[in-house]
């Protein structure tokens, strides 16, 4: 009795592994878009508010205070991580495009993509988590250490910072997806 499914073509050679570089290129394009948008939103997060003081009458009743992303090391770390991710995604998009246009890609390039994507995923996840925790402290405060919430005063600033942290988390998920995709592609080529 003969089987109706064929694993090998008539010539006897194995079926070539699927070329997933089109998907890889698309994910890297999404990574660039998410990193650039998070970067722009973070850089534009500045707000100035007049805050009342409890000083005696000869002193001003209100003080003008700025909220900027530069005031927090966590947000500076997020800025650097997003900048590096933008640069990295451009470089790897070029490499992915070169892999699409070449007839066969080397397992060595796939291995380097897996390693570098994993490192970048770790950097982006840590930066997004750090910025998210500081944004949460700004939103809710911490009564145990007398840190007051500031998002009731600096609402626009908090929206920008929170949105940037959320989109950065999307960039980390895209990087993890790229690690999985490159690992699968490498596995299929080396089998």
Curated annotation (Swiss-Prot):
Q: Which InterPro entries match?
A: CASP/CASPL, CASP_dom, CASPL
Cytoplasmic side of membrane: 1-22, 95-118, 182-191
What's an example GO cellular component term for this entry? Answer: plasma membrane
**Hey, which stretches end up on the Extracellular side?**
44-73, 140-160
Keywords, ordered alphabetically: Cell membrane, Membrane, Transmembrane, Transmembrane helix
Q: What is its main location?
A: membrane
Q: What are the transmembrane regions? A: 23-43, 74-94, 119-139, 161-181
**How the protein sits in the membrane?**
Multi-pass membrane protein
Q: Where does the protein end up?
A: Cell membrane
This protein's source sits in the domain of life called Eukaryota
Keyword Secreted appears in the UniProt entry: no
For this chain, the family text in UniProt reads: Belongs to the Casparian strip membrane proteins (CASP) family.
Give the quaternary structure.
Homodimer and heterodimers.
Protein's UniProt name? CASP-like protein 1D1
